[in-house]
Amino acid sequence: MRAFLKILMVLIFMSVAYAKNPSTLSKEEEVLQHLQSFSAHFKQVLKSEKPLVYYGVLKAKAPNWALWVYEKPLKKEIYMNDKEVVIYEPNLFQATITPLKDKTDFFTILKRLKKQDDGSFKTTINKTTYRLIFKDGKPFSLEFKDEMNNLVTITFSQAEINPTIADEIFVFKPKDENIDIVRQ
C-alpha cells in the first residue's frame, strides 16, 4: 500500500509540475498550430541567372484556400483550393485551371513544418524542401527550390495572423467575359 501511495504522490507531483509549464511549444509553433488565416504583402525573388522580383498580396485561409495577387511587374491572380489552381492573367485575357495533384497549398506546407535547431522550420513535400523563418512572432520568409532548381524566396511584410477573410475572395470570378478559360 505504501508503494502505491508513493507512486501516486510522484504522479501528482509530476502533474502539478507539468501544469505550471503546460506548453512545451515555442511561440512560433503555437502560431503555426493555431493559424486559421493569414494575410500579408509579399516580395518574391526567383534567383536564377537573371533574378526576377515580384510584389503582391497573399490571403490564405484554412483548410487550404489561398489567393496570391501579383501586382508588379505584371498583374496576375492565383486562386488555390484543395482541388485546383486557377491562374488568371488579365493582360493575356486568360485563366488557366489546373487540377491540384499534390497537396502543396499554403496551409498544407505550414501544417507540415517542423522546427529545426537553427530556429527555422522545414518540411519536404514531393521532393521540394520548404524553409520558413519567423520574425517578431510572425512568418517572415519562405524559401524553396522550384522545378528548375532556382531558389525562390518569399518575404512577407505587414503580416496579419488570423484576420477575418471572406470565403468569396478565394473563388475565381472572371472580371471580363472575353477571357479564354483553359483547362489542363
UniProtKB/Swiss-Prot annotation:
SUPFAM superfamilies: Prokaryotic lipoproteins and lipoprotein localization factors. Residues 1-19 form the signal peptide. One of its GO terms (cellular component) is periplasmic space. InterPro entries: LolA/LolB/LppX (IPR029046), OM_lipoprot_carrier_LolA-like (IPR004564), OM_lipoprot_carrier_LolA_Pbac (IPR018323). The keyword Chloroplast does not apply. Its main location: periplasm. GO terms for biological process: lipoprotein transport. HAMAP family: LolA. Participates in the translocation of lipoproteins from the inner membrane to the outer membrane. Only forms a complex with a lipoprotein if the residue after the N-terminal Cys is not an aspartate (The Asp acts as a targeting signal to indicate that the lipoprotein should stay in the inner membrane). Belongs to the LolA family. Monomer. NCBIfam families: PRK00031.2-1. This is Outer-membrane lipoprotein carrier protein. It comes from Helicobacter pylori (strain HPAG1). The gene is lolA.
